Amino acid sequence: MADEPSQSSAPAGPTTLLELKLHSAREQRPVPDSAVIHQTLAADGSPWMLISKDGPATLIRYPDLADFLISADGLEVDAWPAPDNVPESCKQLFISQIRSLALSRAGHLVLHGSAVELGEVAVAFLANSGGGKSTLATSFTKDGHRLIVDDGVQLESSPEGYLALPGIASLRLWEDSEAELVAADSQVAPAAGYTSKRRFLGGGSFVFCDQPRPLARIYLLGDDPEAALSIVPLAGHAALLPLLEHTFTLDFDDRDVRARNLRMLAQLVTNTPIYRLDFPRSYAELPDVREAIRQHVLDPTRPPG
């Protein structure tokens, strides 16, 4: 598949072909508590995601939404919507979370963020959910820049450094960002049942880069919405630790996997400039933020503003 996950192959980069098989809805069979190796909770305290072993594969369950089975090598994903749910829920969960987790099992480095093309290079924005990374990256399309990927930035080592690889050509935005950044004729995917975020497909004003681009900068977004615009270099542990927090990892209980991630991130920190980016979360300020980032990519010694 090119833009939409379906019962076909999904491009996962030049070295990996990730297969998603979307099946008909089925009842979610009980998973014994003893089989659950990890769970995350929703804001109301209810289970949001359960991870359990299913033979050599791994089952990821979103209660009342969908089940995903990731193969032992991370190259195949089977998905079953829960009854009375919509396939788009599976698609959005696959794009935003499952795809990156499967790629991590296949040995790839995937960071929780978005990436955009600036000239011939890529810059990546990393943040927690709701931290503004998709909004910031999408806003660059206002100036004619192409998006590379939303939600999960897959990186590949090269002799010259790291490459940011293109992903699925769609992006997800909350309603307030949609009102500011989305053209009326943009193509929107069907609604997902679990979120008010809408998913917009590539095309029109949202042009996606379909080739790997050298990674020039990584910006870790600060979480203070009132902060003044600033760009501060990070190095060593100050860069490594937040990158580790933003790394997708399915097999987090595997010591070899943890060691592999640390090696890859250490190499990334050595070869790629990492910065903390603070800026006021105001749509009116975004043009100045974009210009500061463009100038910083051209001349990292120049102060923002």
Language model features: what each stretch is:
Residues 136-137:
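Post-Walker A alpha-helix
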Residues 60, 108, 257-260:
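Short secondary-structure boundary/capping elements
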Residues 62-122:
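Extreme N-terminal, non-catalytic leader segments
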Residues 133:
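Conserved lysine of the Walker
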Residues 52, 95-99, 200:
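Short Pro/Gly-enriched beta-strand edge/turn motifs at strand-loop
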Residues 2-15, 114, 118-128, 143-305:
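Glycine-rich, often acidic-flanked micro-motifs
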Residues 140:
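Aromatic pocket-lining residues of Rossmann-like dinucleotide-binding sites
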Residues 1-85, 291-305:
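Long, basic/Gly/Ser/Thr-rich N-terminal segments
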